């Protein structure tokens, strides 16, 4: 397992983050800070292997006073330069997250809770990068032989 920090608003650095180098990317309460959500999601998709997953946890209540009071002062909620400028609301609803994931080329796999409005005021979403990640049969065979010997 390997992990690394990633600045969502900077161009990709393939020396630090290999293209198609990750099976899973976890983004918890960070993607709403993207200056352009769809572009950021497209960059993340480039980092995922075929069939890789993007796991997102995000606040999904667009008018949450608590969210604006607690997070707004810390992170700032005005750096966006995409469709959110129209209504000056940085947070996305569950369905809006699912829409931007599709726009970025992902397939939606899971949204929990399933209902749009959640008493948690946030959702967990899982999206899949296109394609199928096929294992290298020779590498698997070598590993099994090294691990368990020949039988």
What are these model-derived regions, one by one?
Residues 1-151:
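4′-phosphopantetheine-dependent carrier domains
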């Amino acid at each position: 397992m390997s992990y690394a920090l990633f600045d969502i608003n900077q161009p990709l650095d393939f020396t630090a983050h290999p293209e198609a180098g990750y099976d899973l990317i976890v983004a918890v309460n960070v993607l709403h800070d993207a200056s352009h959500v769809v572009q950021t999601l497209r960059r993340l998709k480039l980092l995922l292997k075929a069939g890789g997953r993007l796991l997102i946890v995000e606040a999904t209540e667009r008018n949450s006073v608590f969210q604006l009071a607690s997070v707004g002062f810390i992170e700032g909620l005005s750096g966006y330069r995409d469709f959110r400028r129209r209504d000056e609301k940085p947070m996305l609803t569950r369905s809006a997250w699912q829409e931007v994931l599709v726009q970025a080329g992902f397939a939606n796999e899971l949204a929990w809770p399933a209902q749009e409005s959640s008493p948690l005021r946030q959702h967990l979403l899982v999206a899949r990068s296109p394609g199928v990640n096929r294992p290298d049969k020779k590498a698997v065979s070598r590993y099994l032989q090294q691990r368990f010997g020949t039988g």
